[in-house]
Amino acid sequence: PAAREIVGGYRFIVCTSEHPRHLSTEHYFDFSEQFRRDYLPYTIELGRSFVQPSYQVRGNAKSIYALDNIWDGLGALIVLNPHARYLFGKVTMYTTYKQVCRNALIWFLREYFPDRDQLVTARNPLGLDLDDPYYKALFTGRNYEENYRILIRKIREFNENIPPLINSYMNLSPTMRVFDTVSNPDFGGVEETAILVTIPDIYPEKRERYTRWRGWSVNLRRRREEFRIRLAEHLKSFTKKRNQP
């Protein structure tokens, strides 16, 4: 706010009926009657998101809180639309993301966040080799937490990371649903996976942090202090490098 800058944003549509008019996801996915009737009228569709370039650079103190600020915005959206029970949209992976990492990530997501009711299906699903026994054998942990750590280690072996936004959703709610993956020819061929989050099922600490006014106030004070400390460290490091012969 002090800099009067837009950090980032989310395109969204607040749904009020069972007709998926103008929804981005409707171009690539078919919705079941159950989804149209019981979910869509109470849904906020989240479209393309962005973080402005000056907040994307690693090592820049500004970049630390960019994603957090976007979640603050989503929290405000939930508060302003009390009828909404679901967040629905697509998470994106680029074709430069290594396929073995992509497949391991999607296998994990479908294992722990399945769509057992076939609420949403892709019109042209991306061919994924998820039946390869390699992926099932990869996850030897006893629960979500252990297999999550295995996933992180495996992906890092290929010098990749779980995309930050996907990682945020994975740790937002235990009842998230993950649907099919498609290639989006209208946006450079990126690979997009549809997801659904039930707002009342969001972990209490996340809900408190991003949707309650008291939570916003505490979070803002905390982030201001963290930003002040990180900025001081950043300036100290810059000054030290500048004074070196």
Model-derived segments and spans:
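Non-catalytic substrate-recognition and accessory regions of acyl/acetyltransferase enzymes
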Residues: 1-44, 173, 177, 187, ...
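Acyl-donor binding region in acyl/amide transferases
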Residues: 14-176
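Glycine-rich, charged/polar anion/phosphate-binding loops
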Residues: 180
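Residues that scaffold, gate, or flank divalent-cation-dependent active/transport sites
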Residues: 183
